[in-house]
């Protein structure tokens, strides 16, 4: 059940077009899906050191969200890349911070030791995918996912079509706020519609082999009973039921997606407002009553 929410008449898009939202971190499950497709084809080993997958190394961009500024980069030490794998990046156990905007990329702890949410890990994974496929993320996602599923209103960077149909995001006070990504950021630059994202989730839920990779041996999220993290998705295990879920939070937008793994019922909720997370949570609970301890994490705001 896809749900899109806008605040007022000024949020309407031109007649005859789809209402496109910025999905923020709902990009991460899509990138995980693309990554696991390569795993199932034998083109990627989840436990192979990243250093072996990036023969030319990795240059971390510190000012990633300064979209109009020249890049400020640092080369990540090879010995650090040797400790990282696609599995640790997908499960947020890499030890990388969420973001490192003011200095070189460094580990907070030894990879695999614990869970810590990391956008930087998915940006690194984006470079791995580019190296393995020879395609930038937008092209790879289009060929592998968007075109086959008919996701006509989804992209990892701004295009003329996206710009025409993009719902204006809003601050809590109602001011228009949104980012227009001229390049792909695997962690957060997805543009899509609720219906497109629901189709993506349906494809995932129908793919038992890939779904089993997502949910196998998840890691516990600290101080969050019954909440775990798999490969690309959060996992709740409550009252003999299991759910996968993720949220998105970015300038002007909030979003949530959840699916019941027992019934395969799913909900996607987008809000074009920075105070829209309570609305998104209420939409989730209307269809999937819960309880949902994952939605109580401090990150999900």
Where are these regions (language model features)?
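Active-site-proximal loop and beta-strand segments within enzyme catalytic domains
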Residues: 5-120, 133-135
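Carbohydrate-binding/catalytic loop surfaces
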Residues: 74-81, 160-186, 234-236
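Generic structural signal for secondary-structure transition and capping sites
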Residues: 94-98, 150-154, 209, 219
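A small/polar active-site loop signature that marks catalytic segments
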Residues: 107-111, 115, 131, 150, ...
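Short, mixed-charge aromatic SLiMs
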Residues: 56-64, 145-155, 220-225
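Short, solvent-exposed loop/turn and secondary-structure capping segments
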Residues: 1-3, 99-103, 157-158, 280
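Catalytic loop of the DD-peptidase/beta-lactamase superfamily, centered on the K-T-G motif
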Residues: 1-4, 18, 22, 113-114, ...
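Well-ordered alpha-helical segments within folded domains of soluble proteins
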Residues: 30-32, 121-126, 195-199
